[in-house]
């Protein structure tokens, strides 16, 4: 699993589980507010007066209204198994080398 997912998922899951109000800033500067209802590899479902499906590629920053504990409780140090999918084989998570194009 990619390192980004192993940080993202416990953080988002803690926000969802504890119903923490969040501000989500998009790459175009728009600020969305609400609670994370659910999420998967590509989207976050944000609920306020309405539910909005927000694509992760459009998100710049997720800011919780209060501190949350998002430590992984798996004693083996691995990732919890609450993910709803995996990265397709056709999409590598990291480039293999640092060669310039």
Swiss-Prot record:
Single GO cellular component term: cytosol
Domain Sm positions: 9-68
Signal sequence extent: none
Superkingdom in the source lineage: Bacteria
GO biological process terms on file: regulation of DNA-templated transcription; regulation of RNA stability; regulation of translation, ncRNA-mediated
Keyword field: RNA-binding, Stress response
Composition bias type Low complexity, residue spans: 70-86
Pfam families the UniProt entry points to: Hfq
Segments for region (Disordered): 63-101
Gene Ontology molecular function, alphabetical: RNA binding
Known role: RNA chaperone that binds small regulatory RNA (sRNAs) and mRNAs to facilitate mRNA translational regulation in response to envelope stress, environmental stress and changes in metabolite concentrations. Also binds with high specificity to tRNAs.
Family: Belongs to the Hfq family.
Subunit structure: Homohexamer.
Protein name: RNA-binding protein Hfq
Organism this protein belongs to: Sodalis glossinidius (strain morsitans)
């Amino acid at each position: 699993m990619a390192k980004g997912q192993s940080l993202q998922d416990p953080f988002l899951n803690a926000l969802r589980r504890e119903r923490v109000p969040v501000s989500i800033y998009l790459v175009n500067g728009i600020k969305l507010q609400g609670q994370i209802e659910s999420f998967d590899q590509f989207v976050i479902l944000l609920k306020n007066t309405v539910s909005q499906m927000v694509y992760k590629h459009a998100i710049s920053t997720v800011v919780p209204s209060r501190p949350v504990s998002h430590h992984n409780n798996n004693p083996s140090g691995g990732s919890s198994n609450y993910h709803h999918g995996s990265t397709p084989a056709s999409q590598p998570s990291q480039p293999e080398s640092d060669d310039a194009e």
